[in-house]
A protein has these predicted regions:
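C-terminal alpha-helical cap/extension of soluble enzyme domains
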Residues: 2-10, 15, 20-24, 48-49, ...
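Active-site beta->alpha loop and helix N-cap motifs at the rims of alpha/beta catalytic domains
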Residues: 2-167, 319, 343-356
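Structural alpha-beta junctions
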Residues: 83-86, 90, 198-205, 262, ...
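Generic alpha-helical structural signal
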Residues: 39, 73, 77, 106, ...
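Residue-level recognition of short, well-ordered coil/turn positions
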Residues: 50, 117, 175, 201, ...
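Catalytic alpha/beta core domains of metabolic enzymes, predominantly
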Residues: 144, 154-296
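Short alpha-helix boundary/capping motifs
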Residues: 73-74, 140-141, 170, 198-200, ...
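Hydrophobic, Leu/Ile/Phe/Ala-enriched alpha-helical segments that form helix-helix packing faces
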Residues: 45, 79, 83, 196-197, ...
Length: 356
């Protein structure tokens, strides 16, 4: 099956740059999906002004694909149904996570299309023994079904290292429309941006930061390369981030502030860079960086639990839980950076929902 073209309004928004939260999974204590809270979470992101959602991704927990849980189609359907009304008023970018070997990935791509998703965010985790050529063939097959959102996921949370040569070939695939860089590494981030900049398709591919450790600096930086005597510029236009699954109203405000700063010839950039350090400190705690990200999903859940958007921090994997001392560190950042949270907005949102 050949895919449909990307909706022009969605493509315009994708290129301009927006906030795309990675959607978490709301569970009940018995590890079944909490439908009311799952749907309310989607509505919360839309109420914050997010320009899209990524569902079935790392933050949604890869375990949703295991037969004993079998929740991939459910989460895709719930989010799609909740987005439907809002999408009549403004363009929204619906991104579906896709992973696994080619047969599995193609089935997931078809499933994403069934529920009206615009792009597939393709994770290459688990394909560590595949050569660059095999990976490119895999990506070409997926791109023939759905527009592709490339994804550099750091090895610490299930990704793999990818060469500059891989990215150079990847960006030439005609239906690659965007790339999320979540390498958490400046060298590897540079590999991707250089590969995009070298391509004749450079202007067709939107770059989104997934580097939760460097969000503000990524969004403020212009990358320049001298290519055949011509200066080529490329920048991250938005973010597709697990960190933006929490305090999302503030994320939307932050991206708007960054865009305004750039438009004003970087007026106020010092203040933004200082904000960036705060965001990194908060992310280090939420993502449990000091314990190699073991508590990253539970950390997101804990913030949502405190706000009343989730009932608990339960995850499908027993390995996914808050690390020792992480709760106290979350207390610290709440105390130190109250202006960076959106608790008041969430209170108003939940009051309007009249559910909890």
């Amino acid at each position: 099956m050949k895919n449909a073209a990307l909706n022009p309004d969605v493509e315009k928004l994708l290129q301009e740059g927006t906030v795309i939260p990675a959607h978490p999974l709301a569970l009940k204590p018995e590890l079944t999906i909490d439908e009311d809270r799952q749907r309310a979470l989607t509505r919360y992101y839309l109420a914050c002004g997010a320009g899209g959602l990524a569902v079935g991704v790392h933050t949604t927990q890869f375990e949703i694909r295991k037969p004993e849980f079998n929740l991939l189609e459910t989460v895709l359907r719930f989010a799609s149904e909740e987005i439907q009304e809002e999408a009549k008023k403004r363009p929204l970018i619906k991104v579906a996570g896709i992973c696994g070997p080619t047969n599995q990935a193609l089935k997931e791509a078809e499933l994403a299309l069934k529920y009206g998703y615009d792009l597939g965010l393709v994770s290459l985790g688990g394909l560590n023994t595949w050569s660059d050529a095999q990976l490119i063939e895999h990506m070409v097959s997926i791109s023939e079904v759905i527009p592709v959102f490339g994804f550099y996921l750091q090895p610490s949370v299930g990704g793999r290292l990818l060469s500059f040569e891989y990215w150079r070939d990847f960006v030439e695939i005609p239906n690659v429309r965007a790339i999320k860089v979540a390498a958490f590494n400046r060298y590897q981030t540079l590999d991707v941006i250089r590969a995009v900049s070298l391509s004749k398709r450079s202007n067709e591919i939107a770059l989104y930061t997934g580097n939760d450790d460097n969000i503000v600096a990524d969004l403020l930086t212009t990358y320049r390369f001298d290519i055949n005597g011509k200066s080529i510029e490329k920048r991250f236009v938005g973010g597709l981030l697990g960190h933006w699954a929490i305090w999302t109203k503030k994320a939307v405000e932050l991206l708007n502030e960054i865009k305004q700063c750039i438009a004003d010839n970087y007026s106020g950039v010092d203040k933004l860079m200082s904000k960036g350090i705060v965001v990194t400190d908060m992310n280090a705690v939420i993502f449990d960086a000091k314990n190699s990200y073991k508590g990253c999903i539970a950390g997101i859940h804990e913030v949502l639990r405190r706000q009343g958007l989730m009932e608990g921090v339960w995850c499908l994997s027993p390995e996914e839980k808050l690390s020792k001392g992480q709760m106290e560190e979350i207390d610290r950042i709440y105390k130190e950076y109250p202006a960076f949270t959106d608790d008041e907005f969430v209170k108003q949102f939940l009051a309007a929902e009249k559910k909890y």
